[in-house]
């Protein structure tokens, strides 16, 4: 069984907001390839994996997105905006981004026989 976590190419700040500072921060040498659900599925299938399950996960809350949009730098989850990150809002935001396929992270579980 393989469990892999990768940055999501459809991250809300990349695909919808198109925040150049965030894009430059995200596309660095450790992240040579960002995947979508489709590209990660094809990659794993080509490598011989089966029973592939890919789920979007949102690791950073709304405060982080606001901080990026306003201040153009990371750390929003620890910024002056962090007070808005109630459990209910965080869950709703995560679910909304998952429904839009715009989470920041993809988690894949696959098996090889």
State where each predicted segment sits:
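A SAM-dependent methyltransferase catalytic signature shared across enzymes that methylate proteins
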Residues: 37-57, 82-87
């Amino acid at each position: 069984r393989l469990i892999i976590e990768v940055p999501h190419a459809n991250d809300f700040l990349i695909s919808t907001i198109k925040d150049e500072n965030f894009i430059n921060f995200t596309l660095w040498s450790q992240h040579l390839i960002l995947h979508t659900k489709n590209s990660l599925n094809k990659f794993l299938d080509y490598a011989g994996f089966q029973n592939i399950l890919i789920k979007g996960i949102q690791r950073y809350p709304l405060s982080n997105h606001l901080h990026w949009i306003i201040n153009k730098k990371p750390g929003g989850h620890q910024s002056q905006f962090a007070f808005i990150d109630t459990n209910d809002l965080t869950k709703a935001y995560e679910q909304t981004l998952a429904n839009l396929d715009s989470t920041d992270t993809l988690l894949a579980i696959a098996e090889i026989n």
